[in-house]
């Protein structure tokens, strides 16, 4: 079969485009094997992520990278909400009261763009705490190595991707740390370089205490880890279902 020179050019161009076009996937199972730092992170100019230690296998790494990407996505939603609605926003008032929006914005920036060069996520039960708490510990911060976090096997079976938010109960029912990306942010804040040596910390963990901080101690509402976690889950859920799926406080 013969082709005219014009048709030959067209076919050559199509072939060239086909060879140069990036491969895309309908699922994230292959993409998540890549480090999030090698991919575009919407909402952040210089997002950073911890190092995954060699004791984590391919499946561990895929799920941890997926959680890292969820941290970037949900904090971007939170930051965008702050910028667009400010301190008068119902979501802001619900979790930070009259606390400083500059503090909240700064914490989001710290979580996503501060250097994490020394932070390490490891998958070996080096301290034996995962085995000692098999259905409770999803991970733990290492006091003897402050930049290190151990991720237990329970993390992979108990923590869910953001894509499932609002489909397994309300946020009040399951808690924000039910979601891997939000749980990962709380693990970041156990690391002194991330928490600014405890400026942000787990000063109150129960929902009742978190709400009390909002209403009566806004200075600490903007310093309390769980206020951030509930805020992020609440705001993100509103992008899934109008009004979100917080549940009854």
UniProtKB/Swiss-Prot annotation:
Keyword annotations: Glycoprotein, Signal
TM annotation in the entry: none
Organism lineage string: Eukaryota, Fungi, Dikarya, Ascomycota, Saccharomycotina
InterPro entries tied to this protein: HRXXH (IPR029482), MetalloPept_cat_dom_sf (IPR024079), PRA1-like (IPR039124)
Protein name (Swiss-Prot/TrEMBL): Protein ZPS1
Gene Ontology CC terms: cell periphery; cell surface; extracellular region; fungal-type cell wall; fungal-type vacuole
Gene assigned in the entry: ZPS1
CDD domains listed in its UniProt record: M35_Asp_f2_like
PANTHER family: PROTEIN ZPS1 (PTHR39399:SF1)
One Pfam family per UniProt: HRXXH
Sugar-bearing residue positions: 28, 57, 98, 217
Signal peptide coordinates: 1-20
Protein's organism: Saccharomyces cerevisiae (strain ATCC 204508 / S288c)
Protein family membership: Belongs to the ZPS1 family.
GO molecular function terms noted in the UniProt entry: integrin binding; metallopeptidase activity; zinc ion binding
Alphabetized Gene3D superfamilies for the sequence: Collagenase (Catalytic Domain)
